[in-house]
Amino acid sequence: MGFKLNPFSKKPKDEEPLPLEQYEASEQKILGLVTKKEAKLLAIAGTGFLLDSYDLFIINLVSPILAYLYWGGLTGHQDYPSGIRGVVNAATNIGNIMGQLLFGFLGDFFGRKFVYGKEMMVVIIATILIICLPDRIPTPTAKMMWLFAFRVMLGIGIGGDYPMSASITSEQSLINRRGALLAWIFSNQGWGTLAGCVATLIILACFEKPLNDRGEYTKLNGVWRIQFGIALFPAVIVLIPRLRMQESEQFKNSKNMKSPGEGDLDSASQIELHDFKKKESLTAEFTTSSPSTASLSDKKNPGSVHIRPNNEVAPSSAPSRAPSTTSVESNTEGKESDIQTGSSFVSYFKEWRHAKLLIGSALSWFLLDIAFYGINLNQSVILQEMGFNKGVNEYHILQKNAIGNLIIAVAGYIPGYWVSVVLIEVMGRKWIQIQGFLICCLLFGVLAGTWETISTGGRFACVALAQFFFNFGPNTTCFVIPAEVFPSRVRAFSHGICAACGKAGAILSALLFNKLTEVIGFGNVLWIFFGCMVAGAVVTLILPETANRDADLIDRLEIAAMQQGRTSIIDRSEKWAWWKHGI
């Protein structure tokens, strides 16, 4: 095995799958892109994210209908309180936090197979309860509380999909294709948003005669229920395949503390960690290779460190915490209880080198989602600020609002995701995340400084570009990095924590956006988003570049180093070490 120092170098074409992988590299690819098994994984997990995005963002298109139906919008005296609007908009994100933490923990504790699919059951039940809102509920506020309660439940199911799909995809992908597959799955959020816009336009077209010709706006009561109810179809379709998904072999090995590969680690003294004395780096671009390939790699990368073939440590195997019976035995005497405890989540993150990765991943996601959801959950409000709320009647206003959302989705939202899919293995995660933060920062600065004077076309272009660089930027990488930077034994819960922090930012934005817009104006709210983008770019510097990073192998090497009395496997004197390994 070798470790290449250049995180952006070309991967060997003959790279073999990870030892415990379910997908064979030699399998014929569909259209030269993905294998059949990868396509199945993308369909099962990707459909879930399409559904997740649809459910999360459809409230953006339903909210004006709720204002018309229940808050006097049809009488010309609309009074949809910003506080209640914010709570209803934030409901799914509140549930997301619960679901991400709960299912992330359960995914690590019980296993991926036991948990996967259960979150979709919650989504199906919650969606049915949402569309069954009783008309006999007397007050608009009570109706909104019904929607709030069951959209929280919906959010729990949607939230559970984040850590589970991320962990399963990461553990069942080739290491040099992992980022692209994770980004591909996450990109289905773009299609979900597009589906919401298209579905709304089709539904409105079906109701054109009663709404536009006869002015029977009570029919909107059926429109919003259909908007929510459409999500049931993909949810039911994907449920059975998820329940039948096999356990990740990589995860099973991580939980089997006495697996065959574990014994190899007891010979940790045979790992050539003496290279640290020569100031050589371990944590860089990781590739699995045959002995001959490793030798070739070493010639190109003289700083690589070897594991002897007869004592090969499988990257996907769980780390052993048992004391060595070789030359390191004396160093581990009296430490056995600490080592055994070290397999737990708390013990893993009590070390600063691990804790800072969790902090950096979580904080960057938090800062991103303040701006990302501030824009997306209130895109209809923003379109109104741009003049998209004008029309002959309510029907045309709703139609124009959906068209505006559709244009932004097509112009910036979806292309941004797919540029990430294409370039994530070329540019690396860290660079994409930082440039996305900085360009969004620039765009928000332009909008904030010129909001009162810039033309409608200029506003629209800036918002569309911001959507592009959100997705060709931190919105994609904040999902990918936690799935790659943590080892399998803590991956799902760690990803859940990071995602939950992101949703905390989304909730904060959803609750405060409308109120702050009323108090300080929309332009000044954009200055807050500007600050979040600057902070996000700075926080990203904490994180390592995760392209081709094998977190399980790093975990095992850290344990081997610990057994030899070493505290780190990183050479900070290496050129660009601050970028490769984080500051």
Swiss-Prot record:
Region feature (Disordered): 282-338
A GO cellular-component term linked to this record: endoplasmic reticulum
Subcellular location, record wording: Endoplasmic reticulum; Golgi apparatus; Membrane
One Pfam family it belongs to: Sugar_tr
Transmembrane segments annotated in the record for this chain: 56-76, 90-110, 114-134, 144-164, 184-204, 220-240, 357-377, 406-426, 431-451, 461-481, 493-513, 519-539
Listed GO MF terms: phosphate transmembrane transporter activity
Biased segments, Polar residues type: 284-296
Topology in the lipid bilayer: Multi-pass membrane protein
Residues recorded as bearing Phosphoserine in the entry: 267, 269, 289-290, 292, 330
Keyword Phosphoprotein: yes
Signal peptide extent: none
Native source organism of the sequence: Schizosaccharomyces pombe (strain 972 / ATCC 24843) (Fission yeast)
Record-given protein name: Probable metabolite transporter C2H8.02
